[in-house]
Swiss-Prot record:
Protein's UniProt name: Inosine-5'-monophosphate dehydrogenase
Domain CBS: 111-170, 174-230
UniProt xrefs under InterPro entries: Aldolase_TIM (IPR013785), CBS_dom (IPR000644), CBS_dom_sf (IPR046342), IMP_DH (IPR005990), IMP_DH/GMP_Rdtase_CS (IPR015875), IMP_DH_GMPRt (IPR001093)
A UniProt-annotated Pfam family: IMPDH
Role noted for this protein: Catalyzes the conversion of inosine 5'-phosphate (IMP) to xanthosine 5'-phosphate (XMP), the first committed and rate-limiting step in the de novo synthesis of guanine nucleotides, and therefore plays an important role in the regulation of cell growth.
Presence of the UniProt keyword DNA repair in the record: no
Gene coding for it: guaB
């Protein structure tokens, strides 16, 4: 038998991308499969590096959505550490959004830069409440109870365990003879001080004795290097922020720029508007080195207008999200896979990457979106149940859940989300989203490696080692697809079992 392997035109099955998406019917991720290619490499050889915009590269094609139940500073930090990026939502004041961005930009791995702090006149009962809510003690005490004031003590369990009167003020019980580290200390040196001194927390102070950050003994085992972290030229974590198209958002952009934001997402359900074009032009004129992702768009004409205005990246999707009802309510939008293919093909002429935004519920959806032209995937549903997402967990029927709501839900619009839908100031609100809950997914620091490994395995099955390779094969017609009938979709999922358990992730 011949050792020859067949990869090219002689034995092509299925359809090219052009043939698949010229069928004059809207397709979603479940409506097609990528046909397998030839494997001559290990999954570890697959590179997931990609571009967010013309100028910003990421080591992982994952972006957390600018939703108030998905991305604040904790999520953005975790995403950047793992090679992606988080986009801070704008259902807040300018000052609040800027503060969230600043937390990301000043983050140093292993240093707690926004520790819980109390003042000298707080009482032991306040510490009890923190322990119950957060699960830890060892709280720094500063002169006025804020981060940028002089450190005067620390309160630990040893100080308060046997104190019956929980109304005693902390200045009466706190430890004042403190071991501290000086601002600029390395994490390695800080850890050595903790080990030698046998203390639980090491406060880091500046030259004036003001609290800068905290290093915790409990984090010693958790701290690890993040070689794929998304960092700017000054080695700070990358972070994005969303703004609306309203005139008042120009002040928001200016403040975010001063805070060091890396990319602005102009957040609009229908991005093809004079409001968005004017916002793009304003940003490009005033902040020339600030990248812009415009959108949302689903057609080539929409993409053309925003690219001509100066967009560095495009966000694709109108109505595919799990909490979005735009297509049902407004009768406007487009099937997500078709939208990605058509806009990505057009945007590639200008070297503008596109983001697949919405409708992603598993690794297969991520792989499909990248295979048809997207460079990155923006996710809300997938990340909403993680530890780093805003909000507290709650239980329902024994299942651990977190709240997740669309930014066009009535609940979110009351908090300011209607700016995205040209609906601000209107007495009658028309919802284009819903509120719900999602199951606990654990930490982003464990979930992203799971998604990454699954994506590498998918790329291996396709026969390609990188996102640029797949995009080239798509353009050349070598990446082949097949439409799926309803019965094919049913057969490709779990079927015929009385019951089953389907764990999807296991860490060795």
């Amino acid at each position: 038998m011949s050792n020859q392997t067949y990869r090219d035109s002689e034995y092509l099955d299925g359809l090219s991308g052009e043939e698949l998406f010229n069928l004059q019917i809207g397709l979603t991720y479940r409506d097609f499969l990528v046909l397998p290619g030839f494997i001559d490499f290990h999954p570890s050889e697959v590179e997931l590096e990609t571009r967010l915009t013309r100028n910003i590269k990421l080591k992982r094609p994952f972006i957390s959505s600018p939703m108030d139940t998905v991305t604040e500073s904790q999520m953005a930090i975790a995403q950047a550490l793992m090679g992606g990026i988080g986009i801070i939502h704008y259902n807040n004041t300018i000052e609040e959004q800027v503060a969230l961005v600043e937390k990301v930009k000043r983050f140093e791995n292993g240093f707690i830069t926004d520790p819980v702090i109390l003042g000298p006149k707080n009482v032991i009962r306040d510490l009890d409440a923190i322990k119950e809510r957060k699960g830890f003690t060892g709280i720094p005490v500063t002169e006025d109870g804020t981060r940028n004031s002089k450190l005067i003590g620390i309160v630990t369990n040893r100080d308060i365990d046997f104190e019956k009167n929980r109304e005693i003020t902390l200045d009466k019980v706190m430890t004042t003879n403190l071991i501290t580290g000086k601002e600029g200390i390395t994490l390695q040196d800080a850890n050595e001080i903790i080990k030698k001194s046998k203390i639980g927390k090491l406060p880091i102070v500046d030259s004036q004795g003001k609290l800068v950050s905290l290093v915790s003994r409990s984090d010693l085992k958790k701290n690890k290097e993040f070689p794929d972290a998304s960092k700017d030229e000054r080695k700070r974590l990358r972070c994005g922020a969303a703004v609306s198209t309203l005139l008042e958002s120009r002040d928001r952009v200016a403040a975010l720029y001063e805070a060091g934001v890396d990319v602005i997402i102009i957040d609009s359900a229908q991005g093809n508007s004079n409001y968005q074009i004017e916002m793009i032009q304003f940003i490009k004129k005033e902040f020339k080195n600030l990248d812009i992702v415009a959108g949302n768009v689903v057609t080539r004409a929409q993409a053309e207008n925003l690219i001509r205005a100066g967009a560095d990246g495009l966000r694709i999707g109108m109505g595919p999200g799990s909490i979005c009802i735009t297509q049902d309510t407004m009768a406007v939008g487009r099937a997500q896979a078709t939208a990605i293919y058509q806009t990505a093909k057009h945007s590639a002429k200008y070297d503008v990457p596109v983001i697949a935004d919405g409708g992603i519920s598993n690794i297969g959806d991520i792989a499909n979106s990248l295979a048809i032209g997207a460079s990155t995937c923006m996710m809300g549903f997938m990340f909403a149940g993680t530890t780093e997402a805003p909000g507290e967990y709650f239980y329902e029927n024994g299942i651990r859940l977190k709240k997740y709501r669309g930014m066009a839900s009535i609940e979110a619009m009351k908090a300011g989300g209607d700016k995205r839908y040209f609906n601000e100031g209107q007495k009658v609100k028309v919802a284009q989203g819903v509120s719900g809950s999602v199951v606990d997914r654990g930490s982003i620091l464990n979930f992203i490696p799971y998604l990454s490994q699954g994506l590498r395995l998918s790329f291996q099955d396709m026969g390609y080692k990188s996102i640029p390779e797949i995009h080239k094969a798509l353009r050349d017609g070598k990446l082949r697809f097949e439409r799926r009938s309803e019965s094919a979709q049913a057969q490709g999922s779990v079927h015929g079992l009385y019951s089953f358990s389907a764990p999807t992730m296991r860490a060795e």
